[in-house]
Each structure stands twice: as C-alpha cells, then as structure tokens.
From Swiss-Prot:
EC class name: hydrolase
Organism lineage: Bacteria, Pseudomonadati, Pseudomonadota, Gammaproteobacteria, Moraxellales
Family statement: Belongs to the dCTP deaminase family.
Annotated PANTHER family: DCTP DEAMINASE (PTHR42680:SF3)
Pathway: Pyrimidine metabolism; dUMP biosynthesis; dUMP from dCTP (dUTP route): step 1/2
InterPro entries named among the record's database cross-references: dCTP_deaminase, dUTPase-like_sf, dUTPase_trimeric
Quaternary organization: Homotrimer.
Function: Catalyzes the deamination of dCTP to dUTP.
Active-site residues annotated for this sequence: E138
Biological processes annotated in GO: dUMP biosynthetic process; dUTP biosynthetic process; nucleobase-containing small molecule interconversion
Name of the featured protein: dCTP deaminase
Assigned keywords, A-Z: Hydrolase, Nucleotide metabolism, Nucleotide-binding
Record-listed dCTP binding positions: K112, S113, T114, Y115, A116, R117, T136, L137, E138, Q157, Y171, Q181
Enzyme Commission code: 3.5.4.13
Organism for this UniProt entry: Acinetobacter baumannii (strain ATCC 17978 / DSM 105126 / CIP 53.77 / LMG 1025 / NCDC KC755 / 5377)
Length: 189
C-alpha cells in the first residue's frame, strides 16, 4: 500500500471527480488577502474545509449519550462562518468537499496541527473503498475554554493509500450506512 502524491490526487479529482470542489494549490489567503487556515492539495494529501453547518453538543436535556439510540436533541444546529465549541465539549460539522473514493484506495484523515496545538482534536474514521459523500467531522474541544472553528478554512488533511490489489467487498458493495451522506450525519446503527 503506497501513499499517493499531489499529481495523483489532482488527476483523480480533475478526471474522475474524486474531490469536488477541488483546489489545485494550497490556498492560504482569502480574496481580500486575509490569512486563512490553509486548504487544498499538498505534497501527499488534501486539506479539507469545514462547511457552515454545525451541530454543537448540549446537555440541556440531561440525556445519556448512546450510539445505538442517539437523541438528536443533544445538539444545537448552527449555521455560521464561525462555531464556538464549549469547554470540554464537541461539535459535528461536514466538509465542503464531496468525496468519491476509488475501489482500491483507503483514505485516512488527520487533524491539522493549527487546531491540535490549540487543544482542538479532529476525528474522522477512514474513508473506505468506494465510499462517497460529504465527510462528517468530529471536533473535540479538550480545553477548559471555549474554542473557535472557522468555516470555509482548512480543518483536516486526507491521505490516500492505494492498495496493491482490489478489495473483494467495498463499502458500496456492502451497502454501508453512511454511503452518499450529505450534510452533518448523526450516528446510525
């Protein structure tokens, strides 16, 4: 299994729609010249952006967090350019980018150090072969202070690993429950 380069990412995105929308360079400034947390293709990965759609965890209903029976009322929906995550809490968001993962590729997501150095951890499970959709992002604020997430800017990096052989059964083949997801998707069983 080998990690894929910027050339491969560019070709797969431009010719096969692997990443849409796709930024062919690292974008570090907005149209007004203001600094951004970078996004776009890098040497061996692709930095994704966070959309304006957030679900921030709240315990106002004193619910028990149960992945088998998740209560949607545990979140407050926010649409904004900035999301404030309360201390020691978390939020869900989604990528602006829509992904179509090839059958012989596994994609791993890592948080950007800009956020990690502030105590904000990004978690995403691997994008399996032939999975497609917007990626649901999980942000954990590990600090005892409120934390800010910026929509439209880089939040995580995707690394693409191509296998030497095609998998027998892809995510699409087994009818994965998150296949084709759009928007922020809550836990399913």
């Amino acid at each position: 299994m080998a990690i894929k380069s910027d050339r491969w990412i560019r070709e797969m995105s431009e010719k096969h729609g692997m990443i849409e929308p796709y930024a062919e360079n690292q974008v570090r400034f907005d149209k007004n010249g203001e600094k951004l947390i970078s996004y776009g293709v890098s040497s061996y990965g692709y930095d994704v952006r966070c959309a304006r759609e957030f679900k921030v965890f709240t315990n106002v209903h004193s619910a028990i967090v149960d992945p088998k029976n998740f209560d949607e009322k545990s979140f407050i929906d926010i649409e904004s350019d900035v999301c404030i995550i309360p201390p020691n809490s978390f939020a869900l968001a989604r990528t602006i980018e829509y992904f179509r993962i090839p059958r012989n590729v596994l994609t791993v997501c890592l948080g950007k150090s800009t956020y990690a150095r502030c105590g904000i951890i990004v978690n995403v499970t691997p994008l399996e072969p032939e999975w497609e959709g917007h990626v649901t992002l999980e942000f954990s604020n590990t600090t005892n202070l409120p934390a800010r997430i910026y929509a439209g800017e880089g939040v995580a990096q995707m690394l693409f690993f191509e296998s030497d052989e095609i998998c027998e059964t892809s995510y699409k083949d087994r009818g994965g429950k998150y296949q084709g997801q759009t928007g922020v998707t809550l836990p399913k069983t």
